[in-house]
């Protein structure tokens, strides 16, 4: 099982008491890059032939299975970041890497592919972008303005705050039931919410929420679940259920 990816800085880890998680993730970042660059397990030895990179996608799938998609995305995006002025990066890859790294740690030293040709990494990046986009996850573009009060509305959780096994759009949609974090101007962070897909209740922080879902993006199944929840009457707020984060 892959070591859980920690996407924040050491300062944040120290503040939150997550230094062990930070170090374990940092070490796994290094193992990931070593694996991809190794003479025996690496990309060149296993997925590069006749100038074709990972033709069937099997090598990328293997790396994702071993290290997790978020870590693979980080290593590739970090590689772009470390040589952002290299003109061989495609505009799509450069923009993706910039957006990805904005929401991740600003410490770039650990976890980048220094021994793989830029053109090869660029192709690998295009492949993982395509795979990621295929998940059809909700993003900020599906949400209303941040000034909206979230209580009583369908909110979109940031999948980056979840374990990768829950990186599915149905797990992102929740009914916000309360908490000071629902209010855009409040100092509180807590957002209590019920997952529309399975009914589990959990406490999130406001930064884990992308926003309130625009009505036109609400799937039919979610609309039905929402009506069921609204018709059951008020329930006592509680945390618990599955641990998505």
Where are these predicted regions, by residue range?
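Gram-negative host-targeted secretion-system effectors, predominantly Type III and Type IV
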Residues: 1-245
């Amino acid at each position: 099982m892959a070591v859980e990816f920690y996407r924040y800085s050491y300062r944040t880890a120290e503040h939150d008491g997550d230094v062990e998680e930070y170090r374990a993730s940092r070490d796994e970042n290094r193992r990931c890059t070593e694996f991809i660059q190794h003479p025996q397990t690496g990309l060149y030895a296993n997925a590069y032939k006749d100038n074709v990179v990972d033709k069937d996608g099997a090598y990328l799938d293997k790396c994702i299975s071993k290290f997790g998609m978020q870590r693979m995305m980080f290593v590739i995006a970090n590689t772009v970041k470390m040589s952002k002025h290299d003109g061989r990066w495609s505009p799509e890859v450069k923009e993706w890497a910039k957006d990805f790294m904005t929401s991740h740690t600003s410490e770039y030293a650990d976890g980048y592919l220094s021994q793989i040709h830029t053109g090869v990494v660029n192709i690998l990046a295009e492949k993982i972008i395509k795979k990621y986009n295929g998940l059809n996850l909700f993003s900020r573009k599906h949400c209303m303005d941040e000034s909206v009060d979230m209580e009583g509305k369908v909110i979109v959780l940031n999948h980056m705050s979840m374990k990768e096994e829950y990186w599915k759009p149905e797990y992102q949609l929740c009914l916000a039931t309360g908490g000071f974090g629902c209010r855009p101007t409040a100092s509180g962070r807590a957002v209590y919410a019920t997952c529309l897909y399975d009914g589990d209740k959990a406490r999130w922080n406001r930064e884990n929420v992308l926003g309130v879902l625009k009505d036109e993006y609400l799937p039919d199944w979610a609309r039905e679940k929402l009506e069921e929840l609204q018709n059951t009457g008020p329930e006592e707020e509680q945390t618990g259920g599955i641990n998505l984060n």
